[in-house]
Regions:
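Short glycine/proline-enriched coil/turn segments at helix->beta-strand junctions
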Residues: 30, 48-49, 74-77
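Flexible "cap/lid" loop of the alpha/beta hydrolase fold
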Residues: 1-6, 33, 70, 111-117
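Conserved loop-alpha-helix segment in the C-terminal half of the alpha/beta-hydrolase fold
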Residues: 57-82, 101-102
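Catalytic active-site module of serine/aspartate enzymes centered on a nucleophile-bearing elbow/loop
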Residues: 76-122
């Protein structure tokens, strides 16, 4: 039996998902552990590593303007999609292509003379 999605999820978290996918998210999305929000970060990787950021233009959980500002501060390569908070579910192919682009960029950098791969092997 399909469980109806939570109204808040349907309207504000995954508003661009099908009702079946909303139901799946509702059934499987766990609560955020408080330690995640309260644990200080000692070193943010984006200070020293290339970053990629998917901006969800129709996100109702995190302001898209805040997402853009964060990506800019990180110096991240961005992909803006007209999606809810869950672009990986509503537009998985576009998100996957972006992840593949990021991985290919890292691999190319690592293999270049003086790149990360040479440094790690040396």
């Amino acid at each position: 039996m399909r469980r109806a999605p939570d109204r808040g999820l349907a309207l504000n978290f995954g508003q661009d998902l099908s009702p079946d996918l909303q139901s799946l998210v509702f059934a499987t999305q766990g609560a955020t552990h408080s330690e995640v929000l309260g644990t200080p970060i000692k070193a943010a990787a984006w200070h020293t590593k290339p970053s990629w950021f998917v901006i969800a233009a129709n996100d109702r959980m995190i302001s898209p303007d805040q997402e853009r500002d964060t990506a800019k501060r990180m110096g991240a390569k961005t992909l803006t999609l007209p999606t809810s908070h869950l672009p990986m579910l509503s537009q998985p192919a576009k998100v996957a292509d972006f992840v593949i682009e990021a991985a290919a960029s890292f691999a190319a950098n690592a293999a270049a003379p003086g790149g990360m791969l040479k440094t790690a092997v040396a």
